[in-house]
């Protein structure tokens, strides 16, 4: 799969990178946590002037669309403390380390959260939720040829799993009922693949 971050020949990127790219002058770490680090960087802008960037550094994550032959998808309902509400999301989780194999992480998170085992995993590309301040790269996958296994939730995980038709999820996205960005992005890609006969 071509990487749109580095491949200018994909037909979308037209600007000269030199006209847009910022370069780091120095970096200062303010906080190191279990999930993310907080840094402040001084950078040089394309016009040569200095500026400052406040950044959240994250080790990365994966998210999976478990698609059954009847075009239903296993999704989760989970309370998200940061936004104070229950969200509908696809199975997802952070990497154990920045260099962890992402496919293995996707298979692990799918199995732990839903009990599902994927016979086939297809990469859908990467998703950046808030690239102005966070470097978290979420790699999205489509899981098919599913079989049942056993869930193994972490001690601090509380979620319910159910199957919803892909078409109903599309309607819910249009109604604004699925505000989670990675879930919107991954489901939209799968819907396009279905429309184009790719799956």
Each predicted region: which residue ranges?
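Nudix hydrolase/Nudix homology domain
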Residues: 2-22, 27, 49, 86, ...
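Active-site/binding-pocket entry motifs
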Residues: 44, 81, 147-148
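Short beta-strand micro-motifs in enzyme catalytic cores
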Residues: 37-41, 86, 137-139
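Acidic, metal-coordinating catalytic segment for phosphate/diphosphate chemistry
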Residues: 26-63, 69
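Unchanged
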Residues: 51, 60-63, 68, 94-181
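Short glycine/serine/proline-enriched coil/turn segments at secondary-structure junctions
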Residues: 33, 82, 130-133
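Conserved Nudix-box catalytic region and its N-terminal flanking loop in Nudix hydrolases
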Residues: 2-8, 19, 53, 63-108, ...
């Amino acid at each position: 799969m071509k990487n749109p971050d580095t491949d200018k020949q994909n037909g979308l990127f037209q600007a000269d990178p030199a006209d847009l790219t910022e370069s780091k002058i120095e970096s200062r770490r303010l906080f190191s946590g279990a999930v993310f680090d907080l840094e402040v960087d001084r950078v040089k802008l394309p016009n040569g002037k200095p500026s400052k960037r406040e950044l959240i550094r994250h080790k990365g994550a994966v998210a999976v669309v478990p698609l059954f032959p009847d075009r239903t998808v296993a999704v989760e309902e989970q309370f998200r403390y940061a936004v104070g509400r229950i969200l509908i999301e696809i199975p997802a989780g952070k990497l154990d380390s920045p260099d962890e194999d992402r496919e293995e992480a996707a298979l692990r998170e799918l199995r732990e959260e839903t009990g599902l085992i994927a016979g086939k995993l297809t990469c859908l590309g990467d998703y950046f939720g808030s690239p102005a301040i966070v470097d978290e790269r979420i790699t999205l996958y489509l899981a098919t040829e599913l079989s049942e296994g056993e869930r193994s939730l972490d001690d601090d995980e509380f979620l319910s799993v159910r199957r919803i038709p892909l078409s109903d999820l599309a309607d819910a996205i249009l109604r604004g009922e699925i505000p989670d960005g990675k879930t919107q992005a991954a489901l939209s890609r799968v819907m396009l693949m279905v429309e184009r006969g790719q799956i």
